UniProtKB/Swiss-Prot annotation:
Keywords: Manganese, Metal-binding, Oxidoreductase. SUPFAM superfamilies: Fe,Mn superoxide dismutase (SOD), C-terminal domain, Fe,Mn superoxide dismutase (SOD), N-terminal domain. One of its GO terms (molecular function) is superoxide dismutase activity. It comes from Mycobacterium marinum. This is Superoxide dismutase [Mn]. Belongs to the iron/manganese superoxide dismutase family. It is an enzyme of class 1 (oxidoreductase). Binds 1 Mn(2+) ion per subunit. Transmembrane segments: none annotated. Mn(2+) binds at residues 1, 49, 133, 137. Its EC number is 1.15.1.1. The keyword rRNA-binding does not apply.
Length: 138
């Protein structure tokens, strides 16, 4: 089930934190780096799924309104153009990953991008707003 799948990332993140503490105590730098990578992967998997669950709606949702609608129109020209670009990002992910809509805190605008695995290609300074799981299990 999806909750068991999500729980795997939480356990992986917790395990990586424990192993990081042990490796730091031993000053084992190669193990530190490995577990920092494992922590990033699993923590991102947890965060992405948490956002994704909140994005899902039993009623299917509709076009956004208010500030989000205005930001989409400004960034993409219209909701339909946004949807087409988001669809293209989602359906062309190579391997495992996500399609993402995020707020660029540096440029103060919305961006669409692909996330490889859970965290690779995720621009710094981005606040994720909408994530679509494109892993094979989704």
């Amino acid at each position: 089930s999806h909750s068991k799948h999500h729980a795997t990332y939480v356990k992986g993140a917790n395990d990586a934190v424990t192993k990081l503490e042990e490796a730091r105590a031993k000053e084992d730098h190669s193990t530190i780096l490995l577990n920092e990578k494992n922590l990033a992967f699993n923590l991102a998997g947890h965060v992405n799924h948490t956002i994704w669950w909140k994005n899902l709606s039993p009623n299917g949702g509709d076009k956004p309104t208010g500030e989000l609608a205005a930001a989409i129109d400004e960034a993409f020209g219209s909701f339909d153009k946004f949807r087409a670009q988001f669809h293209a990002a989602a359906t062309t992910v190579q391997g495992s990953g996500w399609a993402a809509l995020g707020w660029d805190t540096l440029g103060n605008k919305l961006l669409i991008f692909q996330v490889y695995d859970h965290q690779t290609n995720f621009p710094l300074g981005i606040v994720p707003l909408l994530l679509l799981d494109m892993w094979e299990h989704a």
